[in-house]
């Protein structure tokens, strides 16, 4: 053991998205000593695979960048195990993700605020924190929806490839709308996306928040520091033990904040005796606080790629030629421009698949190339694809430790496709996507569907394809959800971010989300952490901003969703 007498005001477990925000904001108080413990390595400036936007497919599945999690056999996916990439570097998954910045719909946060005690998490209270974190280069300076001076610098997708414009036009031909900013007044519709790319480099949470703060004398950031144990005296956390370079180090803490993400936070809680008492006893762990919601309510977004052959030589398919990659890479190294300087998810859309939902339940990412996330490209000279899937499925999963060993990965199951509603929306998702991709605007480029292929038509054929081909969109959340103490499944007090029943143990990360949002979740996690930082510091919260936002049937005549062939049970 070493560092036995070292004490900190705040120990933050996890240097990912939320941990980076907290490390910066909490260390703004110069009289507070802050320690961030990150189990992965540093996000080196020279590391092309995490700094180069177009290299995003390389870290996934690579043990140097990815913790390489997997679900158990998913019972409704034909027993498949679904791989889950989790960032193994400073910045966490913000250092290996797709860099897409989506706030979610304002009505997501109205849903968060519905339970008694959650009122301060509605859109009006969250909006100022979104604006605080953003520097939106694509927004007008007078835009009251967007932030202009925050640490996260956002690039509006130029979407200049002709395939993007044809896709947006196809959405209009199918009966939808265009929208200039899916993070602004109107999410519903088709248009350019914001990306966390600045001057040709990935804008991770660590780059935006942690690195600028590291010069502060009261902030310490330790990488390759794997937390093995949280120490307690009754209901109070007193410190942590972590392993680094083969040695154990124990430090004292006035407060411990879990920011390990939707996998590691519930795992550490269960290892600490916080969770379902009977389950913990079955693993030989003495229960400390009975909170059956720890590891439950687990949500994720599943997605598929609908791929098409492109008749015109306008796609990015040739850039996947291994002979061209060195030249593309050199251009990026010396100029930070070219094909490698974009994540290429420069546009897409949000729509409702049926009239039973109040706001978009489908998200489309359009890509002017036909390639899987693992880098496997379609066998065509030119292609394009749409990523699609239901955004607020009612399927719920769980995470459970397998033993008392902190190094053993937990048992994970999301129960994808486990409900009739989930299956219904999946069938609708594929039919809505096909309807858009078959519009006249796509005719100059549409060389035919590659995947799933024209032979997949019936409800069951579609669902069978999803079972075989569906992949995670890498948005796990809600496994230690916020909620009032009256909710037996709530884990975190929404007013303090403290674990129910504990005095100084807090949770700030995606696991605390009460339910997922209808898009990529990195932006909501940053917002949650910004808001939590003010709570932890005892600062007056930012004033809520009550401004109008788009609701279908209220702001235009679009009273219903576009009709597609209905799902038949």
UniProtKB/Swiss-Prot annotation:
GO cellular component, one term: membrane
Top-rank taxon: Bacteria
Any one of the GO BP annotations: glycine betaine biosynthetic process from choline
An example Gene Ontology molecular-function term: flavin adenine dinucleotide binding
Positions bound to FAD: 9-38
Pathway where this protein functions: Amine and polyamine biosynthesis; betaine biosynthesis via choline pathway; betaine aldehyde from choline (cytochrome c reductase route): step 1/1
Cofactor dependence: FAD
InterPro entries: BetA, FAD/NAD-bd_sf, GMC_OxRdtase, GMC_OxRdtase_N, GMC_OxRtase_C
List of catalytic residues: 475 (proton acceptor)
EC number(s) given by UniProt: 1.1.99.1, 1.2.1.8
Gene3D superfamilies on file: FAD/NAD(P)-binding domain, Glucose Oxidase, domain 3
Entry keyword Aminoacyl-tRNA synthetase: no
Catalytic activity: choline + A = betaine aldehyde + AH2; betaine aldehyde + NAD(+) + H2O = glycine betaine + NADH + 2 H(+)
Oxidoreductase keyword on record: yes
Keyword terms of this UniProt record: FAD, Flavoprotein, NAD, Oxidoreductase
Functional description taken from the UniProt entry: Involved in the biosynthesis of the osmoprotectant glycine betaine. Catalyzes the oxidation of choline to betaine aldehyde and betaine aldehyde to glycine betaine at the same rate.
Sequence similarity: Belongs to the GMC oxidoreductase family.
HAMAP family: Choline_dehydrogen
This protein's name: Oxygen-dependent choline dehydrogenase
Organism: Staphylococcus aureus (strain MW2)
């Amino acid at each position: 053991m070493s560092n036995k007498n070292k004490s900190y005001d705040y120990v933050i477990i996890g240097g990912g998205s939320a941990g980076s925000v907290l490390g910066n904001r909490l260390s703004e108080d110069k009289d507070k000593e802050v320690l961030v413990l990150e189990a992965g390595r540093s996000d080196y400036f020279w590391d092309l695979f995490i700094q180069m936007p177009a290299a995003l497919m390389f870290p996934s599945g690579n043990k140097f960048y990815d913790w390489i999690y997997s679900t158990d056999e998913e019972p409704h996916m034909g027993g498949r195990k679904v791989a889950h990439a989790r960032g193994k570097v400073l910045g966490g998954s913000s250092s290996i993700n797709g860099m897409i910045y989506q706030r979610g719909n304002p009505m997501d946060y109205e849903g968060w605020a519905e339970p008694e005690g959650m009122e301060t998490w509605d859109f009006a209270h969250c909006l100022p924190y979104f604006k605080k974190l953003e520097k939106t280069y694509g927004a007008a300076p007078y835009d009251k929806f967007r932030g202009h001076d925050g640490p996260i610098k956002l690039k509006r997708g130029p979407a200049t490839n002709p395939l993007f414009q044809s896709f947006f036009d196809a959405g209009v031909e199918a009966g939808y709308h265009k929208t200039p900013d899916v993070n602004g007044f109107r999410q519903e519709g088709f248009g350019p996306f914001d990306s966390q790319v600045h001057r040709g480099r990935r804008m991770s949470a660590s780059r935006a928040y942690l690195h600028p703060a590291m010069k502060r004398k009261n902030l310490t950031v330790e990488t390759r520091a794997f937390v093995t144990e949280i120490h307690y005296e009754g209901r109070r956390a007193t410190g942590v033990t972590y392993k680094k370079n083969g040695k154990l180090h124990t430090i004292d803490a006035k407060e411990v904040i879990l920011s390990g993400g939707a996998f590691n936070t519930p795992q550490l809680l269960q290892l600490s005796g916080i969770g379902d008492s009977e389950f913990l006893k079955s693993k030989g762990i003495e229960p400390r606080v009975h909170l059956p919601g720890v590891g439950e309510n687990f949500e994720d977004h599943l997605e598929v790629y609908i791929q098409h052959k492109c008749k015109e030589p306008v796609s990015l398919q040739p850039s996947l030629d291994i002979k061209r990659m060195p030249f593309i890479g050199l251009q990026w190294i010396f100029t930070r421009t070219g094909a490698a300087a974009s994540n290429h998810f420069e546009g897409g859309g949000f729509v409702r698949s049926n009239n039973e939902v109040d706001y978009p339940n489908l998200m489309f990412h359009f890509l002017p190339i036909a390639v899987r996330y693992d880098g496997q490209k379609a066998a065509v000279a030119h292609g394009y694809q749409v990523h699609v899937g239901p955004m607020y499925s009612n399927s719920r999963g769980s995470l459970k430790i397998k033993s008392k060993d902190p190094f053993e990965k937990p048992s994970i199951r999301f129960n994808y496709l486990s409900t009739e509603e989930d299956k219904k929306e999946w069938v609708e998702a594929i039919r809505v996507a096909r309807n858009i991709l078959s519009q006249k605007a796509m005719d100059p480029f549409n060389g035919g569907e590659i995947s799933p292929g024209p032979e997949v038509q019936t409800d069951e054929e579609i669902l069978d394809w999803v079972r075989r081909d569906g992949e995670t969109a890498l948005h796990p959340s809600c496994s230690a959800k916020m909620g009032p103490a009256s909710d037996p499944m709530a884990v975190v007090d929404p007013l303090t971010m403290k674990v129910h029943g504990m005095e100084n143990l807090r949770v700030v990360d995606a696991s605390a989300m009460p339910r997922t949002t209808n898009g990529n979740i990195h932006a909501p996690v940053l917002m949650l952490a910004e808001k939590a930082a003010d709570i932890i510091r005892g600062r007056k919260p930012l004033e809520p901003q009550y401004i109008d936002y788009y609701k279908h049937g209220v702001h235009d005549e679009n009273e219903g969703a576009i009709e597609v062939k209905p799902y038949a049970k």
